[in-house]
Design a protein with these regions (language model features):
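Alpha-helical transmembrane segments
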Residues: 63-80
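Alpha-helical transmembrane segments of integral membrane proteins, especially early/N-terminal helices
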Residues: 2, 26-48, 76-83
Length: 263
């Protein structure tokens, strides 16, 4: 029986766990874990909102909130994994002389149980929050669908076109009134595309078989970047156009100026 095994005889799982975390290597590893976790939390709370595109809809706000919360939830697990990698990098073998073997260490069941429980709870929170957010957006879209402005979106290599059947207007640019629900009906006339008005926080595949519907409510006046998010050929990177969320009076004027009628 080794000296290390003899020292563990008669110790409770809690005692072994306490001795385990007081080891020099574990103290350093845990210190790095706390550091990395704090870095990810700071990034989520203070930098992600600045790095995200401008928010012009309830959907985009929900996406920003989801990114922040998911980053915070995953920060402890990611931080612990990175701390192990950091310790290994700092104390790994250098040169041609291998280090001496450390004292043997039996599996610490309490440590494994704590890590598994924490990771499991964090994953459960992420799943519940994600499902709740998804359902709330679906319910909001259903409530607003009756009064929604319908916009038929057509993708083709390599341009977008927009038809407003309720208003009798067609356009190469996407113009929307603020604070009015919008239903996009998306399709393609050739290869697959992906309709992505960035600041609205929605995205839909465009194909030539079935039309795809997505809903949102623009809630802030401003510029929109409309892009294709699926590789669709040689000029895919240039398949983009402009958009604008405008005041209701400005939108009505745009409709009449382009030969349409206001519903």
């Amino acid at each position: 029986m080794s000296e290390h095994q003899d020292q563990n005889i008669g110790l409770t799982p809690g005692d072994r766990f306490g001795r385990f975390v007081r080891r020099a290597d574990m103290r350093e590893t845990l210190a790095w874990a706390v550091f990395y976790t704090a870095v990810f939390v700071v990034l989520a709370l203070f930098f992600y909102p600045k790095w995200m595109p401008a928010i012009h809809s309830t959907n985009m706000k929900a996406i920003e909130r989801l990114m922040v919360i998911f980053t915070i939830i995953s920060a402890p697990v990611c931080g612990f994994v990175l701390s192990i990698a950091t310790y290994t990098f700092r104390h790994g073998t250098r040169g041609n002389t291998p280090p001496q073997d450390s004292a043997p260490m039996r599996t610490n069941r309490l440590g494994i149980a704590v890590f598994s429980a924490v990771a499991g709870v964090l994953c459960l929170i992420a799943v519940i929050y994600g499902i709740t957010a998804m359902n709330s957006e679906a319910l909001a879209a259903e409530r607003n669908s009756k009064n929604a402005l319908v916009v038929e979106v057509t993708g083709q290599q390599w341009a977008w076109s927009f038809n407003y059947p309720q208003l009798g207007v067609q356009s190469a640019d996407l113009n929307l009134p603020v604070d009015r629900p919008v239903k996009f009906i998306v399709k393609s006339v050739d290869v697959n595309h992906s309709f992505w008005p960035v600041q609205l926080g929605v995205k839909a595949d465009a194909n030539d078989v079935v039309a795809v519907e997505i809903n949102t409510t623009p809630n802030k006046i401003g510029h929109l970047d409309v892009k294709c998010a699926e590789l669709c050929g040689l000029y895919h990177a240039y398949m983009e156009t402009n958009g604008e969320v405008m005041a209701q009076t400005d939108f009505e004027k745009w409709v009449t100026d382009n030969g349409g009628h206001n519903a």
